[in-house]
Amino acid sequence: MKDRNTIQVINVTGLGLSGKSAVTDLIGCFDGVWSPDNSFEFDFFRLHDGLFDFMDLLENEVSQGRVDIGFKKILLIAYRMGVDPSIFDLKGNFYSSSQRYNKFFNKNFLNETNNFLLSLVKDSYKAHWPYQRFIQSNFQTFIEKFLLRINLGFLTKKNIYILNRENLNQKFNSYFLTLLKNLDSNSHTFAFNNLSEPYNLNKLFSWVNNVKNITVLRDPRDIYASAKIKNNSKDSFIGFEDVNLFIERYKNNASSVFKGKDERNLIINFEEFINDHENEKKRIINFLNFENLNFIESSKFNLSESSKNVFVWKNYPELKKDILRIEKDLKDYLS
C-alpha cells in the first residue's frame, strides 16, 4: 500500500477532446486515489498569469514593480476563480469567472489561497503607483485622475508590496497539500485534468513535489469529428469549426507537446488505451507505482463506453472532404 502521509499528484493532459478524462477515470478506480468529475478542471495554476507564472515571477524577477503588479493580479484571479456567489451576492457575481473553486475545495479555496499569498508579504508602503491602472477598472482610473486634478492625489496612493522570496517551493507545496486535503482527507493520490498543459511541463515539475504527468494523444480525425458534434450542441468547442483552423491549431499544439526524456512523464495513445487496454493499463500502473493498489470496479470508468470514441470520424460521411484534408496535412499524427 502507498504511504498515506506521502501525497502523489498526477496530471492528465491532452490536446482538447483527447480522451484524457477516460484515463483520469481509470486512475480514480484505484484504492486511495481521488479523481475529479469530468466537469472539474483546476486551471488556477496553469492559466496565463496564474499561480505557476506568479511563482516563476517571484523567484526570478528583479523588478519589485513587476512583482507587486503580479501579486495583485494573482490575488484578483484567485478571487474571480474561487468565489462561489449566491444569487444575492452582487460583488461575487460581478467578479466571478464561474469556476467556483470554493465549492469544490470544501469552501476553503479562497481562505487557503489568500492565506498562502498574504504570507509571502514581507513589508508594504504607500505610494503613487500609475502602473496599477492597467489592472484596475477604467472607472476607478477615471476617479483617480479626477482626484489628482483637484489636488486630492493623496487619496490615490496604493499599497506597494515587498514579498519574501525564501523557501518558495516549500511554501507552495505546503499550500497545495492543504488544498488537496480539502478535496479528500483520506486519499494518498490526487489525479487532475489539465493541472498543466502538455506543451511545457517544466513549471509543473519545478513547483509540484512528487508529481507525474500523463499526456493523452488521439487521432486528429476523431478529435475533429467529436468537435463537430459538440459544435451542434450547447458545448461548442471553440476553434474547431473550420477544418483549416483546426489543422493549423492541431499541428502547432501537437508539435509542441513535451517529449523530453523524463521519468515523470508518460505519453499514451487513446486508441491504444482502448484497443490494447490491458497492456496500456499495465503501463500506467507501472508508471504510477500502483502495483500494490487494489483496483475497484466502478461506473466511473467504462471501457465499452469509451470505445465508442474510437474511429468516430467513420460515422460521419458528410465530413469526408475535411477528413481527407486532415489525413493529408496531419499524416504524421494519425493513429
Feature locations, PLM:
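PAPS-dependent sulfotransferase catalytic core
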Residues: 1-166, 302-303
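Short, solvent-exposed coil/turn elements at secondary-structure transition points
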Residues: 39-41, 219, 271-273, 299-302
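PAPS-dependent sulfotransferase catalytic domain
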Residues: 111-294
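A polyampholytic, Gly/Pro-enriched intrinsically disordered region
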Residues: 55-66, 234-246, 312-322
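Generic structural "secondary-structure junction" signal
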Residues: 44, 225-226, 275, 313-315
